[in-house]
Regions:
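Right-handed parallel beta-helix/beta-solenoid
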Residues: 26-101
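C-terminal segment of classical bacterial N-terminal signal peptides
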Residues: 15-24
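Residue-level detector of conserved, well-ordered beta-strand and adjacent loop positions
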Residues: 79-80, 115, 134, 144, ...
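Right-handed parallel beta-helix
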Residues: 139, 173-188, 201, 205-206, ...
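Glycine-rich repeat segments that build the extracellular carbohydrate-interaction surface of secreted
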Residues: 77-81, 97, 101-120, 132-137, ...
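Short glycine/acidic-rich loop motifs that flank beta-strands on beta-rich extracellular proteins
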Residues: 121-124, 145-150, 161, 183-194, ...
Length: 442
């Protein structure tokens, strides 16, 4: 009777949720199964095998809520030297550790906030989206190229030495990158030994021998704009250039952006390897477009400002304090400020200023270049040790409606032409207070 009453009580307690069903089964003594406690001896000395963390990978046994998505839907992504690519989600409290992971995870239109100085050892390459990169609280911060920068591959070049950031397209109609309040420093570093363009297409060429093409590069085949906004600084390029744009890519330098050298005593070299032609310049165009707006600067540079192998160059900012490096640069010291060739077009707008250029010609408009124009208000001035032509033009069109003044062109001309070049000096054109061995215009 007591056992019957106990059974009734236990049934009632189970129904009311006062006891677990396992208690009911054990107490009744006639359950079809039993719950056994694992013996402690079975757990003694047992270890959990940890899998190593690989790039972009996860520990197989690491605790996690869900697998990390390949693209983060958040509009803000965060990166810090104290972050973690494998386990964090890119939030402010759980930042990524590398810019490469951040651009990979970021959705189209996202802003990436760099929260500390970083040393970068792999390319931040992204496809088919537009991103912004800026410094977070406490910035501006500096991202510096590592001496151990990793190679990467694509379908055109196989394995090669990449830029710090690459903006590419495969299917999107528009892509882009905007930098502001951040410093990217190549630190004069390079991987590879040959200063020349890597070879694309079907070839047995070993592209790993070529140095990196830029700090930032875009080979986009759809409209792409790389914008250096206020506070964006590119320093000490160690490869072919600071920024390279080809095909439909466009570079815009807004007011407050700077490309410069800051390393004491730094001079570029092209090495002695076969096939090495030397660095191109701070900006390297191959069919792309450059727009330097008023207030932007290319300054304190060894070698060259702009090298345009095709494309359009529009200068409204300042190019200053550039010393030619005849033994190192591609095309030697021809066009220290701007080198135009291969149907390229160059224009100095009304706010353009070129000054303090030394040891070579300032503007080179030859090699198949199309035209060079100085608009009213533009100036080329204060070049006390030029030792070259201000402008050299061949088989092209030159318009001077700005001012060329205070230039000491030892043993050379202010404007030297060849091969049927058409020259127009506009109503606002002024060539004054210069020293030229052969004359102002020949």
């Amino acid at each position: 009777m007591r056992k019957l009453l106990l059974s009734v009580f236990l049934c009632f307690a189970m129904v009311m949720g006062l006891l677990p069903t396992a208690t009911f089964a054990l107490e009744l003594g006639n359950a079809p199964w039993s719950v056994e406690k694992a013996p402690t001896s079975a757990l003694k000395g047992q270890t959990v095998k940890e899998e190593p963390v690989f790039e972009y990978g996860e520990q197989k046994n690491a605790p996690r809520v869900a697998n990390l998505p390949t693209q983060n839907d958040a509009t803000d992504i965060y990166v810090s030297s104290t972050g973690n690519d494998a386990q964090n989600t890119g939030t402010k409290d759980l930042p990524f550790a590398t810019l490469a992971k951040a651009v990979d995870a970021a959705a189209d239109g996202a802003t990436i906030y760099v929260m500390s100085d970083l040393t970068m050892d792999q390319c931040a390459r992204f496809y088919d989206k537009s991103l912004k990169i800026t410094s977070g609280e406490g910035g501006p911060f500096t991202i510096t190229r590592s001496a151990d920068f990793k190679q990467q591959s694509d379908t055109a070049r196989s394995w090669y030495n990449p830029a710090m950031i690459e903006v590419q397209s495969s299917s999107a109609s528009f892509v882009g990158l905007t930098l502001s309040d951040i410093v990217l420093d190549d630190a004069g570093m390079r991987k590879g030994t040959v200063f020349a363009q890597a070879v694309s297409g079907d070839s047995n060429e070993d592209n790993t021998v070529y140095v990196q093409d830029a700090i930032i590069a875009s080979n986009a085949t759809v409209p792409c704009t790389v914008t250096l906004g206020k506070g964006a600084v590119l320093r000490n390029f160690g490869g072919m250039s600071a920024v390279r744009a080809t095909d439909q890519a466009k570079i815009v330098m807004e007011s407050g952006s700077v490309i410069e050298d800051t390393l004491t005593g730094y001079t570029r070299t092209k090495g002695s390897e076969a096939g090495s032609v030397g660095p191109a310049g701070a900006i390297w165009l191959q069919g792309g477009t450059l727009v330097m707006e008023e207030g932007s600067k290319i300054r304190n540079m060894d070698g060259r400002g702009v090298y345009a192998d095709g494309g359009k160059v529009e200068i409204g900012g300042a190019i200053s304090s550039i010393a030619a490096n005849k033994s190192a640069m591609w095309q030697t010291n021809n066009g220290i400020a701007i080198h135009l060739r291969n149907n390229a077009e160059g224009t100095l707008t009304s706010t353009a200023l070129i000054e303090k250029i030394s040891s070579g010609s300032i503007i080179y408009c030859a090699g198949g270049a199309k035209s060079f124009k100085m608009e009213s208000g533009s100036k080329i001035t204060d070049c006390a040790r030029l030792n070259g032509n201000v402008i050299y033009a061949q088989n092209s069109t030159v318009v001077i409606d700005g001012e060329i003044s205070n230039v000491y062109a030892t043993g050379n001309h202010i404007l030297q032409t060849a091969g049927g070049t058409a020259v127009t000096i506009g109503e606002n054109g002024r060539i004054l207070n210069n020293h030229a061995h052969y004359g102002a215009v020949t």
